[in-house]
């Protein structure tokens, strides 16, 4: 079985990462490609007994997420990661662990993310009860050279872009 790619989707909270991941997953399933979505929130809930957001907690979480994605890719499964991963160092580490990484940047303006926020994250950040939210209290380090830039989670052209660069035979594109 040949290795597959990791598609690492990054962007501000509520930018459309999960929606993009699900659109990509649907396309891959229709193509008969084994795939799995690792949504950062879901993985954190499933694997972290007492989730925290300190720098150390985040370092550990993103390392775990990258290792899990790389493990799936080595087993022939396209791993689709949807996680804020607001520091370049997190994404760089993922690329070290998964050399066939395709980085997708969901480029959604902060104001739009705040309007779409169904979890109330931005309201909590403004009130001080979520002081660690990337984009408000912490900087979001946008990727300098992402493989794909998407305008929100419903950018079908960007989904097609991922499919075009996805290794078809397990070799790097």
Question: Where in this protein do the model-derived segments appear?
Answer:
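Walker A (P-loop) phosphate-binding loop of P-loop NTPases
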Residues: 14
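Glycine-rich phosphate-binding loop used to anchor ATP phosphates in small-molecule kinases
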Residues: 56-102, 106, 112, 122-125, ...
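Conserved substrate/cofactor phosphate-moiety recognition/catalytic segment
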Residues: 22-70, 74
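Phosphate-binding P-loop
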Residues: 1-4
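Small-molecule kinase domains that catalyze NTP-dependent phosphoryl transfer to phosphate-bearing small molecules
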Residues: 107, 115-173
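Conserved beta-strand scaffold positions in the cores of enzyme catalytic domains, especially
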Residues: 37, 101-105, 147-149
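Conserved lysine of the Walker
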Residues: 17
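Hydrophobic anchor at the beta1->P-loop junction of P-loop NTPases
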Residues: 9
